Amino acid sequence: KRQMKVSRYFLPHILALSTSSPFWMGRETGLKSYRSVQWRNFPRTGIPPTFGTYAEYEQIVRSLVRANAIPDASKIWWDQRPHHLYPTLEFRLCDICTRVDEAVCIAAIIQAIVAKLWKLRRDNMTFRVYPLSLIEENKWRAVRYGVSGNLLDLGKETERPARDLIEELIGWFLDDVLDDLGSRAQVEYAFKILDEGTSADRQLATFRETGAMDAVVRRLVEETMEGVRNGPGTGGG
């Protein structure tokens, strides 16, 4: 459960990189990830609470099952949760990437975060556990602005550009695990996202250039097909 507690800090950073839903019902929403807002209408969603032990989490699940609220733990839909069948930690808050390279990049970042936090624990070090309310503030900023806005640097208690914090995450915090994982190229693709914008940014740019939602849809199809035709590492040029 320690991994789940400390890795919550990075959830908004991951969401910001994946934002891809700026429209709803054919209209601009003013958000980069409206899908995240819609998802919050469901129960048992959002940034997860912390648990002192795994037994505490299991007790919550048992209580919900006994009360007939859920059939099993698969119906807990937090942004991050233990898998109910496998010994894995799921990261579930991402928007839908429209380029294969972006999806691979974000998966590699998540893997690297977990590997780095495990390495810290192995070396008798740790990462601070931050309050849920502060992480939720950053999540809202990611939903609203994607990589174009500011996030809170919770350690320094200051506001900084999301791009700067994500660059630090990759270039400083994760750097020493990337070569061991063999994922440096995939993780560093995030620099391309930071430079060119997310899918949400591209969709908005297309709409403002053309004024046509059909053009946005065509671009989404083209981006998806890049990876289908050519495979990861070749699309998004």
Give the ranges of each region predicted by the language model.
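Glycine-rich, acidic/polar active-site loops that bind/position phosphate-bearing ligands
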Residues: 1-8, 12-15, 114, 168-176
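Metal-dependent DNA replication initiation modules
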Residues: 2-48, 52-57
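C-terminal accessory/tail domains of diverse enzymes
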Residues: 34-237
